[in-house]
Amino acid sequence: METNDMKYLQLLATEYPTIAKTATEIINLEAIMNLPKGTEHFLSDVHGEYSAFEQVLRNGSGVIKRKIRDIFGEELDDAEINSLSTLIYYPEEKMDLIADEMDDIHAWYRTTLFRLIELCQYVASKYTRSKVRKAMPEDFAYILEELLQENYNEDDKKMYYEEILQHIISLDRAEEFISALARLIQQLVVDHLHIVGDVYDRGPYPDKIMDTLMHYHSVDFQWGNHDILWMGAASGSRVCAANVIRISARYLNLDILEDSYGISLRPLALFADEMYKNDPCTYFQPKNEDNIDYSKAEITQIARMHKAIAIIQFKLEGEIINRRQEFDMNHRLLLDFIDYTNGTIHIKGKDYDLLDSHFPTIDPENPYKLTTAEQELIEKIMASFKNCRRLQKHVQFLYAKGSMFLTYNGNLLYHGCIPLHEDGTFMEMKLRGKKFAGKELLEQFEILTREAYVRPPGTKEKKYACDIVWYLWTGAVSSLFGKSEMTTFERYFVADKETHVEEKNPYYNLRNDEKVCKQILEEFGLDGDCGHIINGHTPVKEGKGESPIKASGKMLVIDGGFAKAYHKKTNLAGYTLLFNSYGLQLVSHQPFTSKEDAIKNETDILSTRQVIEMEINRKRVRDTDIGKKLNEQAEDLKKLLSAYRNGLLHEGR
């Protein structure tokens, strides 16, 4: 045995000093590895739609209702199943309604507790006692553990069981106990949650989604293009902050900045009112997709703010393009192509009339230079982003739990794309003087995204990293954007829709090719035959016959459109994916009405399940990434056991 191996075994022996302890741990590890694989839940492109997100999270994409049918399908009718499901999703709110309706609330408590305990036993059966115990609320952990481990068909145990429940009811703790059971069931039906990008965008409550995820038991993120924009703003990128504000103004969602995060937009409002007071800002009128009741004066002011921050954004983008020639984006220096006298712009060999040619803050001789007032404004805005504790807390969580891509249990997860040429080869990009492509490119993007947040302000490293974060939002070789260019300026200022076209990266055609998907999987160190790519970012237009299952099941696109704006395009309100011990299941969801309707009328999101792959042999923990680590531990312990038995090491006490 080599010296290093012996040193490692000696170190291991300090934790397992005897044959008995070593053998016991091996047995424990083998037992865990033989348990069924836990359920993974995949969500993508939530876009700030908290109500629908919360419902899908609470119902486990329909898993809870299916478990109820498994146990009580012959005992309960559909109405009773819906009622029990709603109770588990929203225990406190539902019990408030039930308490007003029930004549004998104690009898209802008793029946409900019996059912919840039986259901909890069922969903806990695939876990170790230790794992279930850790998931329990402290106040009820001892009693819950007793109740979940008993066999209540035995007469002597049944009386003990009923006595416990009777005491819970008589001591007025039934509602708290029901809530504890409901939350435990919610936690146990999903072992791990993957958010495949874009918590943020036009939806009103990304902050609530982040608060929820920060308290979720096991979660990871693959950053999306809208997430990266907010991360950039929180890191100190002025252009990212300008983009965040512009999008929020465009979709009448400034409340997320002012109310949810406490970022004052008063300086922007004052600046806009002064600079654009006689400007109708016709092409900057916000989109009122939710028909929110705003006064004409409010809409007018938001339109001014919208135009003011858009112009600042275009100037800041020009600064980056000029100083980062390696980004190869000079064709996006559109302020250079404007004829300010005639109100036209020259794009790709053609002249177009500008819809709006009122540019009071642009110097035609130096169009990207901020005015003194603009400079002061953006500095105030950046101070607000930097000093917003809640936003910084959320962004830190995104950094802690997130990444550009993730390999997990044989699958590859990423939000946008892997930039490809037409022939399927990986696109290259030069970063800090060296070219990268494929997996290495995404790894470098991640390193620089992290540097943008942690590098000291004012350093060249910080500035470069922040510029890369902006590039990830808009660049042609960005794995998060996936298009040739972002035509934001043209959509505001040019009527001809020919100029609005954003050509998708060849990836989006090639991802239908099984060979290409296998190539991508192998690039990231996965088995091309067994693995899958889980992708978000582009809404699947089911109404036009598009399928989320591509390349013979190698590619699964799970952006079905949580955002209400996409419902008409997708005919859906989102896809989610489940990966349990039996295989992969894609779940499509119809639009969600409201939390209030769900609680009062026991409505749920209508979900349709499609089995993608069914395992011939049920997957066990040993087949997972965690299982491989546990197996390595078991093998090391077997070596330690052999060393004890062969006299190479002596047992301690």
From Swiss-Prot:
InterPro entries: FBPtase_class3, Metallo-depent_PP-like. Pfam families: FBPase_2 (PF06874). Pathway: Carbohydrate biosynthesis; gluconeogenesis. The keyword Transport does not apply. It catalyses: beta-D-fructose 1,6-bisphosphate + H2O = beta-D-fructose 6-phosphate + phosphate. Gene3D superfamilies: 3.60.21.10. Its EC number is 3.1.3.11. Keywords: Carbohydrate metabolism, Hydrolase, Manganese. It is an enzyme of class 3 (hydrolase). GO terms for biological process: gluconeogenesis. Its cofactor is Mn(2+). One of its GO terms (molecular function) is fructose 1,6-bisphosphate 1-phosphatase activity. Belongs to the FBPase class 3 family. This is Fructose-1,6-bisphosphatase class 3. The lineage of its organism: Bacteria, Bacillati, Bacillota, Bacilli, Bacillales. The gene is fbp.
